[in-house]
Amino acid sequence: MSINNISAPRFDWTHAEIKALFDLPFMDLMFRAQTVHRENFAPNEVQVSTLLSIKTGACPEDCKYCPQSGHYNTELEKEKLMEVQKVLEEAALAKEKGASRFCMGAAWKHPSEKDFPYVLEMIKGVKSLGLESCVTLGSLNDDQAKRLSEVGLDYYNHNLDTSAEFYDSIITTRTYQDRLDTLSRVRDSGIKLCCGGIMGMGEEQKDRVGLLRQLSQMTPHPESVPINMLVKVEGTPLENVDDLDTFEFIRTIAVARILMPKSHVRLSAGRQGMNEQTQALCFMAGANSIFYGEKLLTTGNPEADKDMALFANLGINPEKREEHSDAAVAEAIAAQVVKQEESKLFYEASV
């Protein structure tokens, strides 16, 4: 493969071609990935997102990596659906700290009709602050995808997690095809996709190849591709799984960048366990998005000040979006306070 034609998006990557990329000498792979990255993105900019759990715990799914699953005893305290006003206050704080995208996650198999209107209000409020909006709510039906699109949702996160072949070893309560069907509904509704996977769950390299191949065959590619390192949580079935080699994780990011040259590749969960040198290599490999803040749903994340210090050392700047004045932010939150006074926005939403 010529270095001169590797940046054009393709949707027909074979398993053998992707395996060959993984097998390149590390420096050659890094050079190729960085070349693709520079052809498509500002090389020293990273998109910064903040992730908030708007409803925590008691999830009926049995994902073996997840502390929010109701199947495992992780001593995680379940929490009710957050008030819309509180969510918008968190969004405003995230923007103040430099985030350009605000992601909201709910531990559901799928959203109920009781819960859904409140999530729609959260999305509208986040967008009124000048932030990109993203939610992860589980499986969606056609009507729910349409309603999310109508309120202007920018991104829907629904990860494939791993290869189709390894998937049943990790999750049994939702099929791989279920996930693909939700992704199709989201795409058909005009919402951008945030879709990636988790590395270090005991999978083999062929499974990382299979996951990236599946993602790269989506037309168009997911606009955002989170690459997570497993965060081991006591009480989950994967708490004692062997660690993934750090260089293999970096290779996975580099291959993702080559396969999906126009996508934001997010260095996602697991950063708290990485030193600055490892994170720098991930950025060199083509990662150009992170989650910013001390917590990702229920797991730890590097402190915001440490991230900004790392950015300064590397000469990296956060991507910028259109600025909204402080008055506009206050007005958006105040509008939600009025709505809250007119309806009950805080209730049990544990399943």
Curated annotation (Swiss-Prot):
PROSITE patterns: RADICAL_SAM. GO terms for biological process: biotin biosynthetic process. The gene is bioB. Catalyzes the conversion of dethiobiotin (DTB) to biotin by the insertion of a sulfur atom into dethiobiotin via a radical-based mechanism. GO terms for molecular function: 2 iron, 2 sulfur cluster binding; 4 iron, 4 sulfur cluster binding; biotin synthase activity; iron ion binding. Residues 44-271 form the Radical SAM core domain. Its EC number is 2.8.1.6. Homodimer. [4Fe-4S] cluster binds at C59, C63, C66. This is Biotin synthase. Binds 1 [4Fe-4S] cluster. The cluster is coordinated with 3 cysteines and an exchangeable S-adenosyl-L-methionine. Its cofactor is [4Fe-4S] cluster; [2Fe-2S] cluster. Keywords: 2Fe-2S, 4Fe-4S, Biotin biosynthesis, Iron, Iron-sulfur, Metal-binding, S-adenosyl-L-methionine, Transferase. It comes from Marinomonas sp. (strain MWYL1). It catalyses: (4R,5S)-dethiobiotin + (sulfur carrier)-SH + 2 reduced [2Fe-2S]-[ferredoxin] + 2 S-adenosyl-L-methionine = (sulfur carrier)-H + biotin + 2 5'-deoxyadenosine + 2 L-methionine + 2 oxidized [2Fe-2S]-[ferredoxin]. The keyword Transferase applies. [2Fe-2S] cluster binds at C103, C134, C194, R266. Pfam families: BATS, Radical_SAM.
